[in-house]
Swiss-Prot record:
Gene that encodes the chain: hfq
NCBIfam families referenced in this protein's UniProt entry, alphabetically: Hfq (TIGR02383), PRK00395.1 (NF001602)
Keyword Repeat annotated: no
GO terms, molecular function: RNA binding
Subunit structure: Homohexamer.
Organism of origin: Haemophilus influenzae (strain PittEE)
Keyword annotations of the record: RNA-binding, Stress response
Every Sm domain range: 9-68
Protein name in the entry: RNA-binding protein Hfq
Protein family (similarity comment): Belongs to the Hfq family.
Source organism superkingdom: Bacteria
Pfam families for this protein: Hfq
Amino acid sequence: MAKGQSLQDPYLNALRRERIPVSIYLVNGIKLQGQIESFDQFVILLKNTVNQMVYKHAISTVVPARSVSHHNNNHHTTPTEAVENVETQAE
């Protein structure tokens, strides 16, 4: 398992398991909304009124509608923190 997967998979799995609505921003600026139905190494299946298969390489940011209780030192990530983390990584 790649180093990046060790954070990505548990985070996406928590979003899927808890059925947390997400906004997914693509690199071209398009915003998609829905719930994560499933995911693998390359794609996320997003469910709303229809199912959409979104390629991860096209995703800029994933923003949950509420806190995510993934098991990363018992830290709950809020939507604001998620955006701040992305902005910090971009600098």
